[in-house]
Swiss-Prot record:
A motif (WSXWS motif) lies at residues 240-244. One of its GO terms (biological process) is response to food. It holds the Pfam family EpoR_lig-bind. On growth hormone (GH) binding, forms homodimers and binds JAK2 via a box 1-containing domain. The chain crosses the membrane at residues 265-288. This is Growth hormone receptor.
């Protein structure tokens, strides 16, 4: 089979000169199998030394032309004239025959020109080069793909502006579209690309493609010469066409100074120093206005302010000074309620000044009229009555406070102890003349206070009325004035309303009378245990020693069961050891002191009086009272 094909090919090659046209030769060559071409290298359609297509272009999408080389003519072997054949494919297969180039002259040497009659834009074309009946090059394309417009024409430039430094300038470059391109009707839409460079440079600077025929060029150096060129292409298809002619741009010198290098403004340094300066200014402002800014951000807390008080005292915490200032101002003093259960002081009725000048204090004390108008030595009982007699601790506390308040002096303490014992005897004497002789004087005078350890101790105030009655009977009897002990000094006033007196003169007759009636002293034991909760030493000495002469056990026993009674342990032991203590050595008479001065004014009606200093009598001080229970008292007493 291969042999017959080889023979047929040789026959055709030998008879190629007999064919009338080159088209048949080309057709035969194209139909020749590849195997024959490999056997005969001269039949190859594309050789390194054979003609080739260089380009095919359509400047306006209406006509096109193709160009090729003729290198084969310069070779050792001459293949004959070069011919171009073309065909148009209407379908998938090439059904039409090849046709030769219609014009070899219009487009120039080694070219083929297709006018508008042979041009179809949307129909593909295939072209080939043949020499001596053989195909040397072949190519297929469409007219729209080979569009390359002609270069723009009429390039020029104008100066836009020059920089302030005179170093740079801006220009505007203008041109016109190719004359054969139908731009007005929109048959072609062209894109333009501008390139420029200095004359001595080799690399062109390209600008972005534009659709207009003018573009500004910025920052061109003065005293430099530039080259500018422009080219165009079909938008969205095709390739750029040829560049236009080069436009030379020379900018004149605008200033006397020439600058060979660019002057770059130090924007970075300016920004850095600007930020640093603003930061410094901000810190200075904050430092100078820090107090005001602090008040705006953190408002101050209002300080405590009280009218008349320095706020610094409140800040420093000096509460004592604040309390002192508050105590001075009347508006800040606390209000005492009228229903207070505690009595703060005892109100006294103060006589008029003219009344004091009429008679002495001694006469007023001895006057019965004065007793009627001013019972209990002018003391007005302001006790509310709510203080219980069973609260010795509270009364003792108030008594101690009065002693500390300079109520009595150390000189008056022995006189007070002696006077209290004498007062007991005085009451016993008065009891003989009273219809109530079976009651003990000690139970009728609870307002007279026995001093213990240089401190007055309060007694229950239930028998205050009987005490006042006894005192009134004694003072109203003129015959008994020579036998009484005169109490001239009010040493203290207890919160419960009792008055503590100091003796001025001891009467011998009174003391002897007290000793001459031991049976009356023994009778006081019964009422003492029933009415009083406390026994002091002076009472125990007078009542307990005479207990064996009178039988009062039946009277004492019921009262012991009713309540707890406490008496002084030392007084019991002393009285038991000395049964004959009822006989006392009478002392010398002492002058009667008058009210000499007012010691303290506690209120408009409360007074503490001082007496003249008197010589101290020779007597034994009563020892401090201890307390024993009722059972111990029953065991000790005979």
């Amino acid at each position: 089979m291969d042999l017959w094909q080889l023979l047929l090919t040789l026959a055709l090659a030998g008879s190629s000169d007999a064919f009338s046209g080159s088209e048949a030769t080309a057709a035969i060559l194209s139909r020749a199998p590849w195997s024959l071409q490999s056997v005969n290298p001269g039949l190859k359609t594309n050789s390194s030394k054979e003609p080739k297509f260089t380009k095919c272009r359509s400047p306006e999408r209406e006509t096109f032309s193709c160009h090729w080389t003729d290198e084969v003519h310069h070779g050792t072997k001459n293949l004959g004239p070069i011919q171009l054949f073309y065909t148009r494919r209407n379908t998938q297969e090439w059904t039409q025959e090849w046709k030769e180039c219609p014009d070899y002259v219009s487009a120039g040497e080694n070219s083929c020109y297709f006018n508008s009659s042979f041009t179809s834009i949307w129909i593909p074309y295939c072209i080939k080069l043949t020499s001596n009946g053989g195909t040397v090059d072949e190519k297929c394309f469409s007219v729209d793909e080979i569009v390359q417009p002609d270069p723009p024409i009429a390039l020029n430039w104008t100066l836009l502006n020059v920089s302030l430094t005179g170093i740079h300038a801006d220009i505007q470059v203008r041109w016109e579209a190719p004359r054969n391109a139908d731009i007005q009707k929109g048959w072609m839409v062209l894109e333009y690309e501008l390139q420029y460079k200095e004359v001595n440079e080799t690399k062109w600077k390209m600008m972005d493609p534009i659709l207009t025929t003018s573009v500004p060029v910025y920052s061109l150096k003065v005293d430099k010469e530039y080259e500018v060129r422009v080219r165009s292409k079909q938008r969205n298809s095709g390739n750029y066409g040829e560049f236009s002619e080069v436009l030379y741009v020379t900018l004149p010198q605008m200033s006397q100074f020439t600058c060979e290098e660019d002057f770059y403004f130090p924007w970075l340094l300016i920004i850095i120093f600007g930020i640093f300066g603003l930061t410094v200014m901000l810190f200075v402002f904050l430092f100078s206005k820090q107090q005001r800014i602090k008040m705006l951000i953190l408002p101050p807390v209002p300080v405590p302010k009280i009218k008349g008080i320095d706020p610094d005292l409140l800040k420093e915490g000096k509460l004592e000074e604040v309390n002192t200032i508050l105590a001075i101002h009347d508006s800040y003093k606390p209000e005492f309620h009228s229903d207070d259960s505690w009595v703060e002081f005892i109100e006294l009725d103060i006589d008029e000044p003219d009344e004091k000048t009429e008679e002495s204090d001694t006469d007023r004390l001895l006057s019965s009229d004065h007793e009627k108008s001013h019972s209990n030595l002018g003391v007005k009982d302001g006790d509310s009555g709510r203080t219980s007699c069973c609260e010795p601790d509270i009364l003792e506390t108030d008594f101690n406070a009065n002693d500390i308040h300079e109520g009595t002096s150390e000189v008056a303490q022995p006189q007070r102890l002696k006077g209290e014992a004498d007062l007991l005897c005085l009451d016993q004497k008065n009891q003989n003349n009273s219809p109530y002789h079976d009651a003990c004087p000690a139970t009728q005078q609870p307002s007279v206070i026995q001093a213990e350890k240089n401190k007055p101790q309060p007694l229950p105030t239930e028998g205050a009325e009987s005490t006042h009655q006894a005192a009134h009977i004694q003072l109203s009897n003129p015959s008994s004035l020579s036998n009484i002990d005169f109490y001239a000094q009010v040493s203290d006033i207890t919160p419960a309303g009792s008055v503590v007196l100091s003796p001025g003169q001891k009467n011998k007759a009174g003391m002897s009378q007290c000793d001459m009636h031991p049976e009356m002293v023994s009778l006081c034991q019964e009422n003492f245990l029933m009415d009083n909760a406390y026994f002091c030493e002076a009472d125990a000495k007078k009542c307990i020693p005479v207990a064996p002469h009178i039988k009062v056990e039946s009277h004492i026993q019921p009262s012991l069961n009713q309540e707890d009674i406490y008496i002084t342990t030392e007084s019991l032991t002393t009285a038991a050891g000395r049964p004959g203590t009822g006989e006392h050595v009478p002392g010398s008479e002492m002058p009667v002191p008058d009210y000499t001065s007012i010691h303290i004014v506690q209120s408009p009606q409360g007074l503490i009086l001082n007496a003249t200093a008197l010589p101290l009598p020779d007597k034994e001080f009563l020892s401090s009272c201890g307390y024993v229970s009722t059972d111990q008292l029953n065991k000790i007493m005979p």
